[in-house]
Swiss-Prot record:
This is Enoyl-[acyl-carrier-protein] reductase [NADH]. NAD(+) binds at residues 48-53, 74-75, 111-112, 139-140, 244, 274-276. Keywords: Fatty acid biosynthesis, Fatty acid metabolism, Lipid biosynthesis, Lipid metabolism, NAD, Oxidoreductase. It comes from the Bacteria. PANTHER family: ENOYL-[ACYL-CARRIER-PROTEIN] REDUCTASE [NADH]. It is an enzyme of class 1 (oxidoreductase). Its EC number is 1.3.1.9. Pathway: Lipid metabolism; fatty acid biosynthesis. The record marks 75 as: Plays an important role in discriminating NADH against NADPH.
Amino acid sequence: MIIKPRVRGFICVTAHPTGCEANVKKQIDYVTTEGPIANGPKRVLVIGASTGYGLAARITAAFGCGADTLGVFFERPGEEGKPGTSGWYNSAAFHKFAAQKGLYAKSINGDAFSDEIKQLTIDAIKQDLGQVDQVIYSLASPRRTHPKTGEVFNSALKPIGNAVNLRGLDTDKEVIKESVLQPATQSEIDSTVAVMGGEDWQMWIDALLDAGVLAEGAQTTAFTYLGEKITHDIYWNGSIGAAKKDLDQKVLAIRESLAAHGGGDARVSVLKAVVTQASSAIPMMPLYLSLLFKVMKEKGTHEGCIEQVYSLYKDSLCGDSPHMDQEGRLRADYKELDPEVQNQVQQLWDQVTNDNIYQLTDFVGYKSEFLNLFGFGIDGVDYDADVNPDVKIPNLIQG
């Protein structure tokens, strides 16, 4: 079939297998060009391995550190007449390139929040790797079914305490949109913490430790975003922020148990704002990102997922002098938080109107990166060619 982008709101409901493969190849080429990372992990579990930062971590571990990788994700395959998800095609491409390099790659498709998928993962580690020495936690999901109670939690993107006047960019109509976001109820805050907080990360590490599949000295990190004051009302001070603060609490207990396990470590890693399927769903982020891209590109400091994660590995996860803040988080977002960058974004924020969107922002760059996520708009791909949407992932365990 011939696959074209079909965008509905903040999601593209189609994905292009050849484009997704080219996108993965581009990230692998970046890591290969930057060179090997010393003292890297050799057996890595990536929870949330198919898109965005999780995919970038899997690529960096494999092609930067020479690691065998086991990936967990929840994606949909293509079938006749219907494309699969971009994460499915990304993972198929990753497996293909890892095999060419002689690297072990196995993936598990299912709900990472469930006990069943945790057990399948443990079984795969025991059978193939023995143990893992690094666990990357990079789940982005709007809902979670609690494995012990069966209760279904849905996350909410809302402020806490007071309603917030929100400036945003309607990416469909390409106009500036002013709206009022009502504050979250306590129940919505609790649900968001249940979905996006640290409980599941802790459950994973506890399960892996109990099963004896974490190597002594193993490290784990969960990815997060903090941002600056422009995004704080909806982000750090909002319901998502409550979940992020829960990560900061849960990491302390995880760190303690890993430290006792042969001197291991657990850290929250703070990464910059990038275009992902998760970030495009957050009100105000498309406008913020369009402005941030413009300012950072002009300064020559613009980075995407792979640049961020490669430097996180090289400098902090595997380096001797990690970028760490007072709370003990690893920081890779310092170029975004450069006061000069934030001041310029803040000034432009108030000046943007429908008439000057294309002059004051890099909305063109935002749209391009958004389509790239789904394998569209990639140089060298023939989008008029007939492609088979049914792409198999070798070494896939279906949960």
